[in-house]
C-alpha cells in the first residue's frame, strides 16, 4: 500500500493537496469578487444600488425626479427594492464563481 493510501486506491495525501489548491483558488476568487460589481434597479431605473462580490453596497443613486418630500414612503420602497435586487445579484454572482471552482458542489460555510 502506498504512503497515505487506503484500500481501493483512496489517497489522503492527494485529497489534502486538492483541498489546499481549492482554498487557494477560493482566496483568489474572493479578491477578484471585491473588484466586481452588480446592480439592482427599481422604479424603471430611477433608483440604482450597486453591490460588490462581498455583498457590500458600494453606491446608491437616486434620480432627483423620484424625490418627493410628501411621499417619502415610495422612495423608501424603491431604495429597498433596488438594494435587495443588488444583493440577490451579488449572491448569484458568488454562486456562479464558486461553482467554477467546486464543480457545482455546494460546500456549506464557504460563503
UniProtKB/Swiss-Prot annotation:
Coiled coil: none annotated. GO terms for cellular component: bacterial nucleoid; cytosol. Its main location: cytoplasm. It is found in: Cytoplasm, Nucleoid. HAMAP family: DNA_YbaB_EbfC. Binds to DNA and alters its conformation. May be involved in regulation of gene expression, nucleoid organization and DNA protection. Homodimer. This is Nucleoid-associated protein TTE0040. It comes from Caldanaerobacter subterraneus subsp. tengcongensis (strain DSM 15242 / JCM 11007 / NBRC 100824 / MB4).
